[in-house]
Amino acid sequence: MWLRFCAPALMAWYWVFFPSTSQAATMENDGQDGFWQRAKNNLSETWHNGQSQDLYVPAMTWHNRWTYSRQKIDKYNERPWGAGYGVSRLDSDGDWHGIYLMAFKDSFNKWEPIGGYGYEKRWKPVAGNDDFQLGLGFTAGVTMRDNWNYIPIPVLLPLASINYQRLSFQMTYIPGTHNNGNVYFAWLRWQL
């Protein structure tokens, strides 16, 4: 049953990551690409020409205390044990692109895999110091949760980071309603 949901996504990922010669040729044009073509180009460039391999270590989960009852918070796991792996690169503007796969213990202490693409516009807030950077962007991918029978669920979330040399503290916020969603999730990313 899950294959019915995954097959279209798997075919699309295959097409992006393993383009035919004719598809690869269409990626090289005069820079007048639309959003979809730029996204495919960035995914393909990151996959084929990643500058670093990355280790992901989930660091914390925080359920927003203004949107959750104390009973719910007391039942939830906020220590997301797990790990992940990815490839990443910096583009000509110094912006970060990454493709990742991570698995961690979710709020119910069940395994949750997530995989996708991340983009961050990078800034160097301290003049003359290229080692320290801040990032702001998004991540788009697919996750699967135990409480949803591990059906693939697409995600599009904000992404922010604090970076120093090869270490990044990345974070996102999952929006939601009362007692649902509204979760801050953070992880460490180490460039190997």
From Swiss-Prot:
Location relative to the cell: Cell outer membrane
Subunit: Homodimer.
GO CC annotation, single: cell outer membrane
Pfam families listed in its UniProt record: PagP
Name of the protein this chain belongs to: Lipid A acyltransferase PagP
Residues at the active site: H63, D106, S107
Signal peptide: 1-24
The organism's place on the tree of life at top rank: Bacteria
Broad enzyme group: transferase
Organism: Musicola paradisiaca (strain Ech703)
BP GO terms, sorted: lipid A biosynthetic process
Residues the record marks as site: Role in lipopolysaccharide recognition: K72
Functional description taken from the UniProt entry: Transfers a fatty acid residue from the sn-1 position of a phospholipid to the N-linked hydroxyfatty acid chain on the proximal unit of lipid A or its precursors.
Annotated SUPFAM superfamilies: OMPA-like (SSF56925)
Reaction(s) catalysed by this chain's protein: a lipid A + a 1,2-diacyl-sn-glycero-3-phosphocholine = a hepta-acyl lipid A + a 2-acyl-sn-glycero-3-phosphocholine; a lipid IVA + a 1,2-diacyl-sn-glycero-3-phosphocholine = a lipid IVB + a 2-acyl-sn-glycero-3-phosphocholine; a lipid IIA + a 1,2-diacyl-sn-glycero-3-phosphocholine = a lipid IIB + a 2-acyl-sn-glycero-3-phosphocholine
Keyword Membrane: yes
Family, similarity comment: Belongs to the lipid A palmitoyltransferase family.
UniProt keyword DNA-binding, yes or no: no
GO molecular function, one term: acyltransferase activity
Chief localisation class: membrane
